[in-house]
Amino acid sequence: MTLQTFTSTDFEVFTVDGLEERMSAIKTNIHPKLEALGEQFAEYLSQQTDESFFYHVAKHARRKVNPPNDTWVAFSTNKRGYKMLPHFQIGLWGTHAFIYFGLIYECPQKVETAHAFLEHLNDLKTNIPNDFVWSIDHTKPGVKLHKTLETEDLQKMIERLATVKKAELLVGIHISPEEFSAMTNEQFLAKIESTMQPLLPLYALCNR
């Protein structure tokens, strides 16, 4: 069985210089874990939603010069891809791992989803755990901690999703390398489930 939890070696992959060299390290160290997570949590999400979920490990095929600074496995209801749909992600940067649900700029249903989120704005503010974080750009590691946001701040991020063509919105958790050093494989898998649970109602709002 492939160990799915991330180690210091996995995070250090993002210090490897050169596109080919870093991609080789990603494929050797991280992709087997993402594949294992993909199989397990595609099944989990399918059971939770009564829909068929498929997993997609990032290939970084468009990169010709610069090596990737993060990598991930994404989960959607389309066999061919995920970027055009609301989706879940598990992945890592050199500084942290992440577990997200969200919509990125390629998704054509951002406007409808933003309106649904705004209708349930107070519920989102109340029901998203305080230690969760919000990202408005999946290509950058910066986030906003949920407990520091006023309802108006959350409203502005959601409205931006509807009005700005390249806008994105993702929500979930970060896990530091230090946290992983004290975390068993079973604890990591349980952490993923406990993170996805409060995000499933957001997925349901996307599919009303």
UniProtKB/Swiss-Prot annotation:
<dbReference type="InterPro" id="IPR053707">
    <property type="entry name" value="UPF0637_domain_sf"/>
</dbReference>
<protein>
    <recommendedName>
        <fullName>UPF0637 protein BcerKBAB4_3786</fullName>
    </recommendedName>
</protein>
<comment type="similarity">
    <text>Belongs to the UPF0637 family.</text>
</comment>
<dbReference type="Pfam" id="PF06335">
    <property type="entry name" value="DUF1054"/>
</dbReference>
<dbReference type="InterPro" id="IPR009403">
    <property type="entry name" value="UPF0637"/>
</dbReference>
